[in-house]
Amino acid sequence: MRAEARGGLERFCSAGKGRGLRALRPFHVGDLLFSCPAYACVLTVGERGHHCECCFARKEGLSKCGRCKQAFYCDVECQKEDWPLHKLECSSMVVLGENWNPSETVRLTARILAKQKIHPERTPSEKLLAVREFESHLDKLDNEKKDLIQSDIAALHQFYSKYLEFPDHSSLVVLFAQVNCNGFTIEDEELSHLGSAIFPDVALMNHSCCPNVIVTYKGTLAEVRAVQEIHPGDEVFTSYIDLLYPTEDRNDRLRDSYFFTCECRECTTKDKDKAKVEVRKLSSPPQAEAIRDMVRYARNVIEEFRRAKHYKSPSELLEICELSQEKMSSVFEDSNVYMLHMMYQAMGVCLYMQDWEGALKYGQKIIKPYSKHYPVYSLNVASMWLKLGRLYMGLENKAAGEKALKKAIAIMEVAHGKDHPYISEIKQEIESH
């Protein structure tokens, strides 16, 4: 495989990181470095009927599969293209009804196995890195992660054994471990979850907490654009995680999911950490121990809320958010990332409950510190401006709505590219109000 298989880029051995991607020519902010079609992808069950199962296009009037009546498509072409993969699920969904419930990871892995059988040769998604070359980090998995893989394998056999030939057990363990480390979540313009996918060439990029590129999606196509000036010889870095949090939290997440500690500029200098864990300016400032205790409380409540989402009512969830903010505000400023995390969750609950004023109130508090804590071209900041803009428009404040939507567009033109359908849709929203 030629190093220049992707124009102006090459695969190389990155010191201390293993494989990586390097620029051979300059790329300016907003430039598209490359795009990569999904090797395999799966639409999340909750988006069925809103997005095409094959190309993920969002549109009205999708046609449903005549057999299962659960998969929806743009047209006959999309349905035909998806059939070799949809047939793995179609009749099972009919037979099992409510009892058909494989996880998204299991569904994606089933599609990867089917794709490998249908298309054993290298695909256009693998110009620089093949799926079989993915890291699995098997030797680093703890018992909990190993048990999860075993239950995924059991589900794969339960739901797909009629329609798929499986490799041996140890190969399946490796494949699930590879998917866990190299899978991508496809999100829409408001960062809502649309599905999961494998993009081999995108997975070649290493991580940095000050990335020089950003990955966005156009349907099932991943696009990689520069968010900093990139010079010939520079390594191309993306971010694997949410960059809102302080260094210790980011590295905990990286170690848990990807088995490494980041040593980028942001992690070695910890320049942003003080502002991220901003403490209230009181006449008698909180002691170091009180701050440490509150950070510990914040991390615990974040985890508690994550679990509570699965079984508590919206009003109970909102109460957790409000009580935790009240407790943290005795030590933390509103701009503290742990406060922001709970405000963001509260905003999400308000949106779910259609409490537009409540959601707007939280969004207004969040946006300024978000703009400070995140990189300049951040999808988190763009999606927050977008939510605010749409809330203002819905509440008949056109001037504020237009201003917020234009701020979202300014970021998205760099991150998504000026011709992205999302941008046309937002411009249409502004004009139609």
Curated annotation (Swiss-Prot):
Tissue and organ expression note: Highly expressed in heart, skeletal muscle and brain tissue. During cardiac development, it is differentially expressed with highest expression in the neonatal heart while very low expression is detected at 12.5 dpc and adult. Specifically expressed in cardiomyocytes (at protein level).
Keyword Ion transport: no
GO terms under biological process: heart development; negative regulation of cell population proliferation; negative regulation of transcription by RNA polymerase II; peptidyl-lysine dimethylation; peptidyl-lysine monomethylation; regulation of DNA damage response, signal transduction by p53 class mediator
Zinc fingers (MYND-type) by residue: 52-90
Swiss-Prot/TrEMBL keywords: Chromatin regulator, Cytoplasm, Metal-binding, Methyltransferase, Nucleus, Phosphoprotein, S-adenosyl-L-methionine, Transcription, Transcription regulation, Transferase, Zinc, Zinc-finger
Domain SET intervals: 7-241
Top-level taxonomic group: Eukaryota
EC number: 2.1.1.-, 2.1.1.354
Cellular component terms per the entry's GO annotation: cytoplasm; cytosol; nucleus
Reaction catalysed by this enzyme: L-lysyl(4)-[histone H3] + 3 S-adenosyl-L-methionine = N(6),N(6),N(6)-trimethyl-L-lysyl(4)-[histone H3] + 3 S-adenosyl-L-homocysteine + 3 H(+); L-lysyl-[protein] + S-adenosyl-L-methionine = N(6)-methyl-L-lysyl-[protein] + S-adenosyl-L-homocysteine + H(+)
Function according to Swiss-Prot or TrEMBL: Protein-lysine N-methyltransferase that methylates both histones and non-histone proteins, including p53/TP53 and RB1. Specifically trimethylates histone H3 'Lys-4' (H3K4me3) in vivo. The activity requires interaction with HSP90alpha. Shows even higher methyltransferase activity on p53/TP53. Monomethylates 'Lys-370' of p53/TP53, leading to decreased DNA-binding activity and subsequent transcriptional regulation activity of p53/TP53. Monomethylates RB1 at 'Lys-860'.
Family the entry assigns: Belongs to the class V-like SAM-binding methyltransferase superfamily.
Name this protein carries in UniProt: N-lysine methyltransferase SMYD2
Organism: Mus musculus (Mouse)
